[in-house]
Amino acid sequence: DAGRYLIPDLPDADYELWVRGYGLADSAKTAARPGDRLDLRAIVAPDAATAAQVYPAAYWYSMLDLPSEAELEPINYLMWIKNMGCIGCHQLGQLSTRTLPAAFSGFESSHEAWIRRMQSGQAGTNMVGIAAGQLLGLPYKYLSDWTDRVAAGELPSSQPERPSGLARNVVLTVRDWSTPEAYLHDLSGTDRRDPTVNGYGKLYGSPELSTDIFPILDPQNNTSSSFFAPVRDADTPSTFEDPVVMPSAYWGDERIWNSKANSHNPMLDATGRVWFTARIRADQNPDWCMEGSTHPSAQVFPTSRSGRQLAVYEPDSGEYTFVDTCFGTHHLQFAEDENNTLWTSGGGPVVGWLNTRLFDETGDAEVAIGW
């Protein structure tokens, strides 16, 4: 009734606390430690523009105009903006995306600045390929219009509501794990068939193109660790070879990505082992995948290349086992069958699977996979 509140289970550390809320301006930061009693005062935002600075990114992203029906006709715009491109990697609407960095301020128009911005870093080739190739340059048009309107003072048309009732008791913890140069594509902490597996346990991340230092987070004990994911063959290519197309506004000419494993997804099995879609070798498939092989799947549909394979990590021992595949892998999912079949996507013209029971018995991927 006195308006006091408790932040529970904080690790013993030094903290900075301040008040942030919808309709408020951030208060001054105050140093504190667990056990301290503080009197933090909220500051009502002096205007709508100040209040909007802490709105969720989606409120700002909603201001982005959509192309016309005629512009959309030849392309799959939303798929590439949302699922396959921009939204998949960037939180469109947060401060650094709804504004243009000072490094790109020397252009005559924001349209030119966005063209230059998307050439930045080791991802520049891919970003330009999507924006200028797949989407025929439309993102440049609408992103530049969006940032122009934001720069001119336009604000989101709706405002988030302040929490009420039990929602005021929700405590959210946002954790930085891995390194500033890396990113996480995905993480897993359980077997989706039985979510009690690894209960209250560690979370395992897949850093994809960025690094081979795979992060591990223990949210119960507030600790993070990592392990190095090796590859089987020395000639496995690395993303470090990907050039910096143009200097980044944040990293300059530095090549911050350096991954051979290029792990896309993790998934735990019933025993708590972590299976990764991860590269273990160069693209060229072994002979038993190709035409002339006696492998049953190769006799039906031989394959010559595989851009990513499989690996399994044993948390207790730290053992990392390679699983070669004749098909590319992307996402993975266990079946509810006696073989604990691990199905994968990303195989292009084929769908691949691994009989994990047979692989555990033999250690031989050639006899345990099919497609």
Regions found by a protein language model. Give the residues of each.
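Beta-propeller fold detector
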Residues: R117, S158-R175, S224-S248, T321-T325, ...
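Signature of short aromatic-glycine-proline-rich micro-motifs recurring in repeat-based ectodomains
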Residues: Q134-T147, R175-Y200, L209-T211, F240-D269, ...
